[in-house]
């Protein structure tokens, strides 16, 4: 029997349980879900300010920070890499409302690196529409595995959403990192269900 462990998380840091999910074969065809949104690809060079604004609009309630902590040079290199596709769901007037990033840098695999919608569109069927486009593009010729990860800071329905679309959990991790509110990336009142513990100065 493995003894339980308690890990102390320092003030100014945050801990989350990450669940990794995968599928190793394309899901069975389904009737396409309709949406008033349209999908467009942002090709290189991606406008960094516009990208960061969308990333923040989608991810702030869930404390997304991965792209926000990158400097311009690193972010540009990441988004403009030939192995990364940035797709954006927009309203008819072109206003960005959702983000889909497909990372093909792995050997015969695709990672759904980022997937999300602005909060006011969640729970209205647009996520299923966006996932349909994601899987259609991810399962290109030669791909043997598509994977994604989510965490307990994400939308509470994220894990079951991925499972409904054919992903199978295969690994669980604990991640500890600097709280993005402590550094000013987000206001202190963001994600009130996750208390901000400031380091003493």
Segments (PLM) and residue ranges:
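Conserved beta-strand-loop-alpha-helix junction that forms the acyl-donor binding cleft
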Residues: 122, 148-158, 175-181, 185
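Acidic/histidine-enriched, glycine/proline-rich intrinsically disordered or flexible terminal extensions
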Residues: 4-5, 9-16, 176-201
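A conserved beta-strand-loop-helix scaffold within acyl/acetyltransferase catalytic domains
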Residues: 66-73, 79-119
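Short amphipathic alpha-helix that is part of the acyltransferase structural core
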Residues: 33-66, 188, 201
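Conserved glycine-rich acetyl-CoA-binding loop
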Residues: 118-132, 141, 153-157
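Conserved GNAT acetyl-CoA-binding A-motif
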Residues: 138-150
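Conserved active-site alpha-helix within GNAT-family acetyltransferase domains
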Residues: 2-7, 153-172, 179
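Acyl-donor-binding surface of acyltransferase catalytic domains
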Residues: 1-44
